[in-house]
């Protein structure tokens, strides 16, 4: 039996999604909780491996099991065995053609900037603090250069293991909600650190340090060293993963919860 789950987590206390020896990971915690409920070892496959400090409201995973359990066992039962900063949002049996990573047609991220002179206290792990006068409208205009299938070498991490730098960005918008500036970006897939590297460069435009044409210039240069520093991890959320309609997976509010959809 193959089960898909929708997962939400606060990544601030973990060394990323991927299971690692001797450090705490989201995957490790989930597999441990699922194995207790299934009464057998469980291995997970995810839609997107988030880095240390990065969060998710719409992560999707799947696993194989011989255990026969009702939906409540895979949601309430698993949640009872998880730490408070990880939660299963939904569970659904899927056919063997479904794969959390390879069946996905798009991933969507939101990056939340807290734009204020003073750092936040309560939301310090859930937003990235940047002071100065950030012009979200300029960031939005500049970001449109990212649309379509392009070579994103300038925005990939040096240690990125992808065989190709090409990705297809479906949509990108930058908006302001009071003190928050939100970068919302969707693509078929993302390179390692791609979203945070894009945000880092957009911030330079929003702060008036670079012209509106800079994103297009960076794409043409194909040189990571010419782009801005990587933005902080704590404002980044994986909010949605898109799959073909045939799987009929639940669609919930994107979040994070303190933001307007």
UniProtKB/Swiss-Prot annotation:
**Alphabetically ordered keywords of this record:** Isomerase, tRNA processing
Any one GO BP annotation for this protein: tRNA pseudouridine synthesis
Signal peptide positions on this chain:
none
Please tell me whether the keyword Cell membrane is annotated for this protein: no
Name the chemical reaction catalysed here: uridine(38/39/40) in tRNA = pseudouridine(38/39/40) in tRNA
Q: Pfam families annotated for this entry? A: PseudoU_synth_1
Family affiliation:
Belongs to the tRNA pseudouridine synthase TruA family.
What does the record note on quaternary structure?
Homodimer.
Protein name in the entry: tRNA pseudouridine synthase A
